[in-house]
Amino acid sequence: MSVHEQHRPSLESRPRHDTIELGALTRRYFAHDFEGQAHARNVARLTVRLGKSFALPRQDLLAIAVGATLHDVGKLTVPAAVLETPGGLTSEEWQVVKSHPASGDLLVSPLVRHPIVRSAIRWHHERVDGRGYPDRLRGSEIPLPARIVAVADAYEALIAARPYSTPCSPAEALAEIVDCAGSQFDPECVRRLVEIDRSIETRGIEQTRAFATAVTCNNGAGLPRFER
């Protein structure tokens, strides 16, 4: 059985009140971390492209896109002043930031039980060498959706324009991620990232845009329909 088959739930409608609450939670996070909104959508778009390269089924692509959009929702528990710090963080501040994957999982747990969504939120900072957080998973212990989001998250963070840092070029970002293949990132996910050209912003964007923005539409009513 493939990894994505292990994570595929039976499809059922989610209760409408949970859908609305999840949409509200997403908007709260985007209001708390304004830069996080563009980052979340860019990560979701790239995640879908990577997921398609693994031939994930459509419903799994929907779920991984929701997880990617919400991957940093736990930063709601991180003070805005810490998120907006222009320089390096203190050790105490860094520990607070590192808590966001587990905090995000806790925030969405009453609303979503889908394993792909939950794994993307909780485990996108795990490393294949076992030195990540929050649970220090190693290699294939990290579900494929989380390994995919980890690569997309890092790439988009490296090329993002921020007031306090100079973005990498796509080539520089890709080179840095390739250097970390096998230690921080799944080598197969990295290989597929290398194969994806920068047509992300042109060819196929209309197909992936709906995945990336679903959780913010119509009070969350545009969320994919899957078993919680």
Ranges and model annotations:
Residues H4-R8, E12-R228:
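Histidine- and acidic-residue-rich, metal-dependent catalytic cores
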